[in-house]
Amino acid sequence: MSIDQSKIRNFCIIAHIDHGKSTLADRIIEKTGTLTSREMQAQVLDNMDLERERGITIKSQAVRIIYTAKDGEEYIFNLIDTPGHVDFNYEVSRSLAACDGAILVVDAAQGVEAQTLANVYLALDHDLDVFPVINKVDLPSARPDEVAQEIEDVIGIEAMDAPRISAKTGLNIEDVLEQIVKKIPAPTGDKDAPLKALIFDATYDSYKGVIIFCRLREGSVKVGDTIKMMATGASDVVTEVGYFGAGQFIPCDELSAGMVGYIAASIKNVRDTRVGDTVTLVDRPCDEALPGYKKVNPMVYCGLYPADSAKYPDLRDALEKLQVNDASLQFEPETSLALGFGFRCGFLGLLHLEIIQERLEREFDLDLVTTAPSVIYKIHKTSGEVIDLTNPSNMPDPSEIEYMEEPYVSAEIMVTSDYVGAIMKLCQERRGVYISMEYIEKTRALIKYDLPLNEIIYDFFDALKSRSRGYASFDYEMKDYERSELVKLDILINKEMVDALSFIVFKESAYERGRKMCEKLKGEIPRHLFEIPIQAAVGGKIIARETVKALRKDVLAKCYGGDISRKKKLLEKQKEGKKRMRQVGNVEIPQEAFMSVLKLDEE
């Protein structure tokens, strides 16, 4: 089955969160008859339950669509739906590497937002042809002409003849399909050259092993060929090749240059396949690997522990399987005195952490305890050594530290002019450094700040949305490290330090954070038969304390009247028992207590 390259279009849809990417993908699939109306459902390409529930796209998904254009020719579209959240930026860049062009969806009511810009720049970095589409024109608040002007002014791409569509009702979807044929270039690549294919994703199937999703740049591959991964050197015999139907794999005879498809080769070892690697043939390898993706570095680290320590091997297995499908997840084993064996995992942001945690609990049926997230600090020791600190409990003694540095990000916040003051105040509270502010149009401003990553990973996004009544949008990228006054805040429960609750704070906010933390824990830890002191300490000095009062049994219930000394004796005996119990008693700390660190600023 030979396919004419000039009839293939590989493209993806990029947009800010909630501007209608997945809905547009649904309409394109429906209009081209890829699925029957019975099989159609909202968010067709979001096939994880989690994605449907939250209404967001987490994984990029690919689908092949056949479209008969107005010129009577049949075209093959390979559409890749991408996520919009900052946390899944790497998913977007992987999808872009498999495409030749991109559709930029902009909401006719909201206009250009922070992540619209970020995603467009990503697409332009990959040399893709981008054309805009203005969505949601059926909304009463839609202002398509102003938005088209805004796209031209802010992003600098031609938008006056952009299709005005409503992905929800299906208005003008044909215009988009025709634009895809006209504006997105056909792929290039020699079918007879040695195989060169880029892995842009992978998934694990318990029957077929690891299935790799790839874009063929050159050459062709069919069943029976022996393929080799260029980065890991692993080789396997191909058992199946094919392309993506909506929600299913469709086998075919061979894949050739310009096509997007999957290869199954009974790859059992999860570590053999790396996203961004190049696949070639063993007997006819290509000269050099394709440039992969820039390696993504985790921004946030946290500990994941199985609630039942016997499940530790299951957790490792589950993390390895998720890593096939999610290249940015990193993990290494660690132990905690309070929680036993677990893993220190690196994530791209808090949403990423939450999603991974939920996927582990749902897909692998694990019960997890998560510790508070922390960023990577650089510690300059007096000996001249520089170490990276991902876990606060590994912080060296203060006497060995010359100074510490923390990561900063460059943040761009787009907000309507009514809320500029509130947003600037929020950034100042979070130790932000003001960079610039410009008005994009009369009512909207773009504010730039440098902020410590430590201040934004917890609840900055929620605070931003609540202070701007949902009007602000936010995008950030890593800048570099800057020197800062930081201290480690330890939490002692019943006079014992709980390593999993330690975290690093800015020196001036240590007292405030410590006090809030103790109050919060007091509400989370259940009462025991003995009094439990909860203390916050910085370097051995207690800076805050709360007490969980003891439950007491009424030992005087059996005394009717009688001598006071009898009652005293019973009360003294109870007091003695409580004292002894406090020395040997264990305090049960619920999972909510570990997570309460995150929600300190919400009150």
From Swiss-Prot:
It comes from the Bacteria. Residues 6-188 form the tr-type G domain. GO terms for molecular function: GTP binding; GTPase activity; ribosome binding; translation elongation factor activity. It is found in: Cell membrane. GO terms for biological process: positive regulation of translation. Gene3D superfamilies: 3.30.70.240, Elongation factor 4, C-terminal domain, Elongation Factor G (Translational Gtpase), domain 3, P-loop containing nucleotide triphosphate hydrolases, Translation factors. PROSITE patterns: G_TR_1, G_TR_2. InterPro entries: EF-4, EFG_III/V, EFG_V-like, EFTu-like_2, G_TR_CS, LepA_C_sf, LepA_CTD, LepA_IV. Its EC number is 3.6.5.n1. Keywords: Cell membrane, GTP-binding, Hydrolase, Membrane, Nucleotide-binding, Protein biosynthesis. GTP binds at residues 18-23, 135-138. Pfam families: EFG_C, GTP_EFTU, GTP_EFTU_D2, LepA_C. Its main location: membrane. Required for accurate and efficient protein synthesis under certain stress conditions. May act as a fidelity factor of the translation reaction, by catalyzing a one-codon backward translocation of tRNAs on improperly translocated ribosomes. Back-translocation proceeds from a post-translocation (POST) complex to a pre-translocation (PRE) complex, thus giving elongation factor G a second chance to translocate the tRNAs correctly. Binds to ribosomes in a GTP-dependent manner. Belongs to the TRAFAC class translation factor GTPase superfamily. Classic translation factor GTPase family. LepA subfamily. This is Elongation factor 4.
